[in-house]
Amino acid sequence: MNPQRKKRLFLILGLLAGVGVAVGFALSALQQNINLFYTPTQIANGEAPLDTRIRAGGMVEKGSVQRSADSLDVRFVVTDYTKSVPITYRGILPDLFREGQGIVALGKLNADGVVVADEVLAKHDEKYMPPEVTKALKESGQAASDAGAKP
């Protein structure tokens, strides 16, 4: 092999190695930013990973909202009408957050089975339901339109 071909070969191999490393870094960064959606049933059954950021969604159980008198801590229970999961949140809840409405909470599941949320998203319209929540309610045998009427 002449020196010019050898030089080209090493250049091409170096470029391929660089592209491979860049793709590896990109995939690693994307994997860390993925927040998978879990229903209360999946969380209660142990399908959700501990100490990993997840999205938990469902309907806020009526009578489950407990607000702390001296801080912004809120504790409530989310259900898909099959199983329920407690969620804690520190901060100001969205204006449209209320019992009997659909929400999606972003946070980490701790060892006690409680989702410690750092963000809570509430539905913004009477007819709107997050797609994940609608799918979970259909799978549990509840129609999305009946969800607000159930206790």
UniProtKB/Swiss-Prot annotation:
What is the membrane topology noted in the UniProt record heading this document? Answer: Single-pass type II membrane protein
**Species whose genome carries this gene:** Pseudomonas entomophila (strain L48)
Q: Which family does it belong to?
A: Belongs to the CcmE/CycJ family.
Q: Which residues cross the membrane?
A: 9-29
Q: Where in the cell is it found?
A: Cell inner membrane
Which pairs of Cys residues are joined through disulfide bonds in the record? none
What is known about what this protein does?
Answer: Heme chaperone required for the biogenesis of c-type cytochromes. Transiently binds heme delivered by CcmC and transfers the heme to apo-cytochromes in a process facilitated by CcmF and CcmH.
Query: A biological process (GO) annotation for this entry?
Result: cytochrome complex assembly
Chain sites annotated for binding heme: H124, Y128
State the superkingdom. Bacteria
Ribonucleoprotein among the record's keywords?
no
Protein name as catalogued: Cytochrome c-type biogenesis protein CcmE
Q: Which gene name does the record give?
A: ccmE
